From Swiss-Prot:
GN (gene name): celB
Protein name, as recorded: Probable endo-beta-1,4-glucanase celB
Function text: Has endoglucanase activity on substrates containing beta-1,4 glycosidic bonds, like in carboxymethylcellulose (CMC), hydroxyethylcellulose (HEC) and beta-glucan. Involved in the degradation of complex natural cellulosic substrates.
SUPFAM superfamilies (alphabetical): Concanavalin A-like lectins/glucanases
Pfam families xref list: Glyco_hydro_7
Lineage summary: Eukaryota, Fungi, Dikarya, Ascomycota, Pezizomycotina
Amino acid sequence: MALTLAATALVLLPLVTAQQIGSIAENHPELTTYRCSSQAGCVAQSTSVVLDINAHWIHQNGAQTSCTTSSGLDPSLCPDKVTCSQNCVVEGITDYSSFGVQNSGDAMTLRQYQVQNGQIKTLRPRVYLLAEDGINYSKLQLLNQEFTFDVDASKLPCGMNGALYLSEMDASGGRSALNPAGATYGTGYCDAQCFNPGPWINGEANTAGAGACCQEMDLWEANSRSTIFSPHPCTTAGLYACTGAECYSICDGYGCTYNPYELGAKDYYGYGLTIDTAKPITVVTQFMTADNTATGTLAEIRRLYVQDGKVIGNTAVAMTEAFCSSSRTFEELGGLQRMGEALGRGMVPVFSIWDDPGLWMHWLDSDGAGPCGNTEGDPAFIQANYPNTAVTFSKVRWGDIGSTYSS
């Protein structure tokens, strides 16, 4: 049974803030995940997911007027953070399938498009993994651990990205007197791109137009033709609201990227290749420390795959400081050590599907990064030719090295 949360998650907050939560209940779809150990094997967890706050309806308290406009916050309702919090309420989402999220047991399918009222609507859902309490995010501490999942990328054409990554978001989603909704309603997103997240930052009105920076570990950015993984360290811990030029110097937005195609393995990943994207793939990422303990310094990030019962190694042995030495600002901003510090503090799993209207995803699958043509990533082309675009993630698990997969 899915988790239905309206006021339940907020009982510990002062009553004065209850007016900021609307009357429509939030109905989190359950997504079973697994915590694994060498001794006990994998144990199921009753976790769930929540859509980002920007997918929720936030409106004037006692009225139907939205607190946002096409250009951002409505200045008459949100001239500042405090007034905005007093004027606006957030409503829950009861039907996640209408936002492109369909869960069943330990599997979740994210859909890019949906026909609504006879028209194809672009959805681009992004969801975060909640802990078993349904109130806070699952923050995974992965030093000297591995993170594994199964993925079906067969319905992701050129120009699409079905992503699973880690973000150093606050476990509560920044829950506070001005943001009583918190993680329960998907607040607090941040990443190493430091982009302006829109009207809300850490659940509060983003009246300054700040960017939301934090460390990011891209476990999987991929479609059926190309794949990358990349750590993105930052000089700060947790979410940092940046403004102006500092938004370009706090985090390594480019990251240390591993792309097998770009490194010359052109027959490694794709339909019918060594990693056959026509079939589901098990993806394993291992975070190895220098002393093989959960408190050690991150020394390597290893990647391997399992398909048809066979363990398939990565085309490079591991991602190390030596491998990343030429990656723009990666070393300057702390490299693997800084990334490891975030993994030690804990990071939140993020799942998404999206297209790229600005760059057409060339950085992932074209212009030397993959085999796709220069125009195949045009969102209009994708919508016209691949209306069933989707990605399915399943059997998400994490734990001791070697405990999450078998051959």
